[in-house]
């Protein structure tokens, strides 16, 4: 089995990487820099997001394993002091995996050009210069005319990230679908939006048709683009749906999702 390592640049992550490589070599495991079958990320959820996009063209052939060297992460099952246990699990690996849905995003520009993206956590669109105005279509039917700061579209596993910060619901990661959450929507006697998150099923398509040409900021996980109208080219439409691809994690032990939610956001219950 070919094992790759993807770490951040902190001193602790560098130390853990060195220890892991030493223990893997001692156990007879193969470390590779290209074409891995298992990728071990060392850092936090941000590091795993970066690794996901680094290897996104080969997702069907890779299983991820996360070691967190800082705060508790939702994608990182192992702590830095559990290297020996992880190496033992790698030696006994039988291909066991758990997978989660991803989000496909298609951006259409006024010149007809189309750009495709894939998100593990979320995509957001907002206008930083004025109220964002867009028409929201669900399965090609106009649902509402949105006015506000922006919109957040997230996966089930991404529902605990930025989506939660803007008032979205936390969704069981075993669900297949995606969620739309509003960012500071404008509601008064003239303009109205639904004012609550929407959770879509596996076959739904969400389309956002933008009315303004300038000032939009588009994100896909950790990547961000400031979009400006240049020579008649500007963003006109975004479409979202559940991706045909999935992300796979090596499942060496069971870590209860709802226990992580409780530990991260609630703490001890008295």
UniProtKB/Swiss-Prot annotation:
Its main location: cytoplasm. Belongs to the NAD kinase family. It catalyses: NAD(+) + ATP = ADP + NADP(+) + H(+). This is NAD kinase. Transmembrane segments: none annotated. It comes from Limosilactobacillus reuteri (strain DSM 20016). GO terms for molecular function: ATP binding; metal ion binding; NAD binding; NAD+ kinase activity. HAMAP family: NAD_kinase. The gene is nadK. GO terms for biological process: NAD metabolic process; NADP biosynthetic process. Keywords: ATP-binding, Cytoplasm, Kinase, NAD, NADP, Nucleotide-binding, Transferase. The active site is at 45 (proton acceptor). It is found in: Cytoplasm. NAD(+) binds at residues 45-46, 121-122, 147, 149, 160-165, 184. One of its GO terms (cellular component) is cytoplasm. Involved in the regulation of the intracellular balance of NAD and NADP, and is a key enzyme in the biosynthesis of NADP. Catalyzes specifically the phosphorylation on 2'-hydroxyl of the adenosine moiety of NAD to yield NADP.
